Structures are given as structure tokens and as C-alpha cells.
């Protein structure tokens, strides 16, 4: 222990100790009014008490990784939607199954995490989610002072080499305009799929997600202003018939977008159909939603996806792509990119955060293909 005189006439007592977590020397101090032998004994006792407290707090380094991971998961689930919980549960389980149940969190180094990444035998998308999950687990551990730094941040995913197959995957994420026209025409040709056709065409023009589209209510539709508020999504986990609207996927998903002439026509038609159904069907379930079945229940994603696949199978030349509701959103992105709309404007319309990986990939792919048209234009000039 040593003592320093302070300008205010008091005395500061210091003592060093070795932090068991970092193995570095640290110091603690107390300030007293006197420098007498009695005061020095008091200071010594207080310093030892402080050191003991610091060392006990450092013992959190003995905590097991899986215990902290479970603790984080219980905490994190309270801040995300049920749909996000379902999406992340598989990655979380993948991590828990890999790591030894007895390993201390302080012993999970960047090398250990890198080995987890290198050993992982799973699709790239799952590996990326698992790495993001590890980042969050260790950020939590740092915040609660279980560890001093996040080892997951230094571990790296292998650089993805883009192949011809990857480029084909991007192309398969959206429809060409002739493909869109053929599919919509088939859906419109049958009375039992007309409502689905209206929804599909609306998404191809608006760029909204299906969950956002079926969560649209009449009060969101500002016809006189030619705008619509996309301020939520339908929580499918509780059932479509309950029609529970929840917050959107991200803050950027909370948006108001302008409506084209055709979008207004679509909204007017579906609302008119709903009013007709309400007048003739006794058990019509009025929940205020726009894109609903003839009984008032929001259109279901699984039924929609099945219907467009069946419609595709009836085409003379079926589209060789994985058709789902999301393809209409991506089709708008590609169409706007082809028409030289800036990426920022597209992102704002479709409500993607930070550009959005898929949005950017489609935009880049389409604009790269457009470079070939430059030569055609220049050749025509001559």
C-alpha cells in the first residue's frame, strides 16, 4: 500500500492486485481525511474489501458458454417478433449443439470460433446467421462483463466466390416482364384466382412484402393523396383468422409510398369485391383488411404460393423459377433498375434497410447486363 497527499489536504491510499481475468496488475484506492496509523489500518481493510469484490466479479470468467448463450437467448427473444425467433432458433440450436457444454466462455477464443466456422457443414445462409448470432451472444457477454472483448468479431467467414450458378440464382429471384404478364394473365383468367391475381400484380408494382400487403387496411389507403401507408405486417403465427397486425420487419419498412394509376385501380377493385362479398355472405368476417378472401380472411401465403405454382404449370411455357410471393417484390426491383431508377429510390420504396442484400444483388446484376446495351446504342449512332 502507498499513500499520496491530495491538494485538498486529504490522503489517497492505493493498493495493487492482479486481475485473474486479464492477469494484469490493477489498482484500487480509497480517500481518507487522516494519515494516522489508525487511518492506515482502516484504509488497508477497505482496500482489501475492494480487491476481494473486484476478484469475485472477475470470477464470472468461469461461467460456461452455453449458460451465457441460453441467458442471452432468453433476453433477446423478448425484443424480436415470433417470426424472427422461429428463423433464428435453428442457428441458435446449431451453435449450442457444437460447443462443449462445459467450456468456459473465457476459453472460447477467436480461434475456437474460427474452427466452428471452418467445420460447419451447412448452407452459406445458415452459416452467416450463426456467425451473426455468435456476435450477439458475445456482445451480450461483454456488456455484462463476463469477458472483456468479443472474440467472434475477429473470426471471419470464407469469402464467397460468385459462380455461374450464383448468377443464375439472382436471375431466378425475379420475373422478366413477359413472364410476369403470362403468369398474371393466367391468374386473372379464372374467377377463383382473381383476388390472388390482384394481390400479385399489386406487389409487382408496389414492392411490398406479402405480409405487408395483407396487413393493409382501408384506413391506410389515402386515395385522394395517391398514397398508401405500409405500417405493419400480419402476424401469421397466431393464425390468419385472428388478423393480428404487428410492427414491420425493420424501421425502414415503416413507410408511406406513392401509388401508380394501376395500383389505385387494383385497390378500388378489391375493395369493391369485398363490399359485395360482405353484402351477400352472412358469415363474412369484417376485419378492415383489403387483400382478403371472399369471407374476409386475409389471403394466406401458403395458399397464394400454391396457386401461382399451379397457374404456372398451366402455361404453355412454364417459368423455370422457384415461384413464391417474394418474386413479385423482386420483379419490381429489377424493372426499376432496368429503367435507371437509382438504388436509393428503390430501397426507399421497398423498405429495405441499408440497401438490402437481395435488392443490391438484383440491382447490380441488372445494371451490369445493361452495359451491353451501351455498345448497341453507340453502334446505332454510326
UniProtKB/Swiss-Prot annotation:
Name of one Pfam family that matches: Phage_integrase
InterPro entries per record: CB, DNA_brk_join_enz, Integrase-like_cat_sf, Integrase_catalytic, Integrase_recombinase_N, Integrase_SAM-like_N, Phage_Integrase
GO function term, MF aspect, one: DNA binding
BP GO annotations: DNA integration; DNA recombination; establishment of integrated proviral latency; symbiont entry into host cell; viral genome integration into host DNA
Domain Core-binding (CB): 63-142
Alphabetic keyword roster: DNA integration, DNA recombination, DNA-binding, Viral genome integration, Virus entry into host cell
SUPFAM superfamilies (UniProt xref): DNA breaking-rejoining enzymes
Active site: 209, 242, 326, 329, 352, 363 (o-(3'-phospho-dna)-tyrosine intermediate)
Domain (Tyr recombinase) ranges: 170-376
CDD domains: INT_ICEBs1_C_like
Family: Belongs to the 'phage' integrase family.
PANTHER family cross-referenced by the UniProt entry: PROPHAGE INTEGRASE, PROPHAGE INTEGRASE INTS-RELATED
Protein name: Prophage ps2 probable integrase
Taxonomic lineage of the native organism: Bacteria, Bacillati, Bacillota, Bacilli, Lactobacillales
Amino acid at each position: 500500500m502507498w499513500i499520496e497527499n491530495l491538494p485538498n489536504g486529504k490522503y489517497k491510499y492505493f493498493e495493487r492486485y492482479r486481475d485473474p481475468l486479464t492477469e494484469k496488475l490493477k489498482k484500487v484506492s480509497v480517500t481518507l481525511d487522516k494519515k494516522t496509523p489508525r487511518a492506515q489500518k482502516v484504509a488497508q481493510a477497505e482496500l482489501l474489501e475492494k480487491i476481494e469484490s473486484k476478484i469475485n466479479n472477475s470470477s464470472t470468467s468461469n461461467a460456461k458458454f452455453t449458460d451465457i448463450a441460453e441467458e442471452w437467448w432468453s433476453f433477446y427473444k423478448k425484443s424480436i417478433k415470433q417470426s424472427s425467433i422461429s428463423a433464428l432458433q435453428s442457428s441458435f440450436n446449431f451453435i449450442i449443439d457444437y460447443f462443449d457444454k462445459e467450456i468456459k466462455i473465457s476459453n472460447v477464443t477467436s480461434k475456437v470460433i474460427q474452427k466452428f466456422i471452418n467445420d460447419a457443414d451447412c448452407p452459406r445462409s445458415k452459416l452467416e446467421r450463426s456467425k451473426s448470432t455468435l456476435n450477439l451472444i458475445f456482445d451480450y457477454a461483454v456488456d455484462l462483463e463476463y469477458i472483456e472483448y468479443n472474440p467472434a468479431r475477429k473470426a471471419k467467414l470464407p469469402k464467397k466466390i460468385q459462380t455461374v450458378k450464383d448468377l443464375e440464382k439472382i436471375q431466378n429471384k425475379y420475373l422478366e416482364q413477359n413472364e410476369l404478364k403470362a403468369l398474371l394473365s393466367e391468374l386473372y383468367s379464372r374467377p377463383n384466382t382473381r383476388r390472388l391475381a390482384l394481390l400479385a400484380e399489386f406487389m409487382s408494382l408496389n414492392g411490398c412484402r406479402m405480409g405487408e400487403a395483407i396487413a393493409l387496411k382501408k384506413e391506410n389507403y389515402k386515395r385522394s393523396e395517391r398514397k398508401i401507408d405500409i405500417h405493419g405486417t400480419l402476424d401469421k403465427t397466431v393464425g390468419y383468422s385472428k388478423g393480428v397486425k404487428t410492427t414491420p420487419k425493420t424501421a425502414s419498412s415503416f413507410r408511406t409510398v406513392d401509388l401508380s394509376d394501376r395500383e389505385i385501380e387494383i385497390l378500388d377493385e378489391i375493395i369493391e369485391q369485398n363490399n359485395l362479398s360482405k353484402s351477400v355472405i352472412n358469415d363474412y368476417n369484417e376485419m378492415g383488411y383489403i387483400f382478403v378472401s371472399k369471407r374476409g380472411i386475409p389471403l394466406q401465403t401458403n395458399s397464394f404460393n400454391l396457386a401461382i405454382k399451379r397457374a404456372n404449370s398451366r402455361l404453355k411455357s412454364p417459368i423455370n423459377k422457384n415461384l413464391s410471393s417474394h418474386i413479385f417484390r423482386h420483379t419490381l426491383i429489377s424493372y426499376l433498375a432496368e429503367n435507371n431508377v437509382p438504388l436509393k429510390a428503390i430501397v426507399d420504396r421497398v423498405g429495405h434497410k441499408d440497401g438490402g442484400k437481395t435488392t443490391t444483388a438484383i440491382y447490380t446484376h441488372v445494371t451490369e447486363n445493361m452495359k451491353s446495351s451501351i455498345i448497341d446504342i453507340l453502334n446505332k449512332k454510326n
